[in-house]
Curated annotation (Swiss-Prot):
Keywords: Cytoplasm, Endonuclease, Hydrolase, Manganese, Metal-binding, Nuclease. It catalyses: Endonucleolytic cleavage to 5'-phosphomonoester. This is Ribonuclease HII. It is found in: Cytoplasm. A divalent metal cation binds at residues 7-8, 105. Residues 1-213 form the RNase H type-2 domain. GO terms for molecular function: manganese ion binding; RNA binding; RNA-DNA hybrid ribonuclease activity. The lineage of its organism: Archaea, Methanobacteriati, Methanobacteriota, Stenosarchaea group, Methanomicrobia. Endonuclease that specifically degrades the RNA of RNA-DNA hybrids. Its cofactor is Mn(2+); Mg(2+). It comes from Methanococcoides burtonii (strain DSM 6242 / NBRC 107633 / OCM 468 / ACE-M). HAMAP family: RNase_HII_A.
């Protein structure tokens, strides 16, 4: 039986993309991921995450990271909620890695509702396939090694993209999270000098809006 784990990195930042990681393996190999030492990516050092990401890709039957740019997020938010965007983004990973069982980190206060939306979204597109089982849980990256692995791939990819932004911009933008003093300082300085934000910024975020208004 094929199983897939899905998790996101970068849902909350004001700078940079959101990355949705997916890892597919045979269910009887899930212990191999656990033995690698995968854990929630937030608890690992960047160096350890990079090392584990390479190992995960070797063990996985398939893997995929779906990226949603700041501009895409801004445009979609004109039409739908962030939860709706998460359903679409997770759905894109499921499309890439179809499986018998789907473990997802719930991106909704009601975890069952998020799982049902993922299921309905998939079955609407594939009415003739055997229905997958969907397990949607808060903290799934702590509960299921396959989701921990997906979390690591998502975080490593976002970290790579943030580092590229720093190089391209020639300035330290920090982590991109609204609470980061370096990020706030970058936004303040950039807007003061340019009266607008570059496309690396999510203009629809309150952190950015307070400068624009």
């Amino acid at each position: 039986m094929k199983i897939i784990g899905i998790d996101e990195a970068g849902k909350g930042p004001v700078i940079g993309p959101m990355c949705i990681g997916g890892v597919r393996i045979d269910e009887d190999k899930s212990n191999a991921l656990k033995n690698l030492g995968v854990a929630d990516s937030k608890k690992l050092s960047p160096k350890r995450r990079v090392h584990l990401a390479a190992q995960i890709k070797k063990y996985a039957d398939g893997w995929f990271v779906y990226e949603v740019s700041p501009n895409q997020i801004d445009e979609l938010r004109k039409l739908m909620s962030m939860n709706d965007i998460m359903v679409l983004a997770f759905g894109s990973v499921i499309e890439e890695l179809p499986s018998d069982k789907i473990y997802a980190d719930a991106a909704d206060v009601k975890e069952e509702r998020f799982g049902k939306r993922l299921f309905d979204n998939y079955m609407e597109k594939h009415p003739d396939v055997s229905p997958p089982e969907v397990i949607s849980k808060h903290g799934a990256d702590d509960l299921f090694p396959v989701v921990s692995a997906a979390s690591i791939l998502a975080k490593v990819r976002r970290d790579e993209l943030i580092e590229k932004i720093k190089v391209d911009m020639g300035v330290d933008i920090g982590s991109g999270y609204p609470s980061d003093p370096k990020t706030k300082k970058f936004l303040e300085n950039w807007y003061r000098e340019n009266s607008s934000f570059p496309d690396i910024v999510r203009h629809s975020w309150k952190t950015a809006q307070k400068f624009i208004q």
